[in-house]
Every structure is written in structure tokens, then in C-alpha cells.
Amino acid sequence: MVKRVRFEAPLIHLIDEAVGRIKEHIRERTILHDLFFRERLEYPTFAWQEALFNAVAHRDYSITGACIEVWMFDDRVQVRSPGLPPPPVTLEQLQLHKSIHFSRNPLIVRVLADLGYLREMGEGIPRMFQEMEHYGLRPPEFSTEGFFFVVTLRNTPVYDDDTLRWLNQFASKEINFRQRRLLAFAYCHGKTFSTTEYERVAEVDRDTAYRDIRALIKSGIVAPLKPKSRSYRIIERL
């Protein structure tokens, strides 16, 4: 551990101070986008702030002598909150991007939502996954250690630099994280894919796969290999 900082303040001031200090330690990275090198933060801002705000909103305040902790490493950020997920919330639900409509501290949640710190109930966790996916990073990890609930964000890329550069050609298109994952898969497999492969890679049912593929066709990103085919090819920009 290089440095340890402790904050004690009313909740709103505590959040603002913690956000400011964390920002100081999140590095910028240089990426290639549309033939230009640009600076980008190593973690999406929404993801780590949502983890912090959720910790403040949902920690178990009956546990005394334990604080919310933010640990920053070279390869990851961890937000550790006293109190295990309260029933009916489970780690499995969180890891499956489920929208959770439950709060241990409803009054605190309402105040933080009114002040703009929290999203609508149930929106934050799915968007954390989307933001990490959009950055080409591994999905958020949820775990428990003793009586702490732990959220881990890693800065390790899911895709290699070549794949990320290729995906950048679709940056102006409205594609979701499932479609982005599928495009990366297709890039590494001859730039073609089938409906069955989409279901497996994106971990969705056939109806969702069909809707996503139709949206990609409508956007001019993919096209059937043959009329009425369930296999598709990527249409690249010139």
C-alpha cells in the first residue's frame, strides 16, 4: 500500500471528497481512434462512481467499526462495503446484469437519487456492464469477503489492440454490448457468424438474438450471406 486516506464527513461531502481523490489516481491511456491518438481514462467514470455511490447508499450502517473502502491497484479498483447483499438480492443476479429493485436504506437512496448521484432504481448495474464492455474491459466482478461486499473493476482489456481498433469503425453506430461482443467474435472468425453463434457468444435466447441481428442489418453493419440465410457477414466501412 502506497498511501492511505481516511474521510469522515456528512454523506454528501464524503462522496464529493472521495470522488475528487479517486479521480487523481485514475490514469489516462492513449488509444488510436479514427486515425488519431486520443487520451482516455483507464476506467469508465460511470462504472467506478456507480460502485462508490452504491456502497454509500446500500452499506449496512448497523455494522460499526467498519468503513467503506476503495482500494486502487495497478490493474484494478475495488470498492468494499460493509454488509452482504440483503435478501432477495444475490451475487448471481448481479453477475447476470439483473436490474435490482431493492434497497437496504430507502431514505438514503431517495436522497442520493434526488441529488443526481444515483440512477433510477435498477438502472445502475446493467449500465456498469455496458460501460465496461464499451471500453473493451472485463465485466464488473461481485464477491463477498467476510462481511464485506466487494465490487472489482479491472483495467485488463478483453480485446487486443488490433480488435479494438477494428471495432472503432462502428463507434458512431448505436450498438449494445452484446452486439459489440459479437462483432469482436466475428472479426476473429472470418468476419462471419451464425444466429446460433450469436446466442452462444452473447448468452441470449433466440428471440433476443433475432432482434439484435435485425438491428445490425438495419444499421448496415451486417448482411445475410445468402437470402433467408441464418449466417451473416460484416459490412465494413471503406
Label every model-predicted segment.
Residues 1-238:
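C-terminal regulatory or interaction extensions
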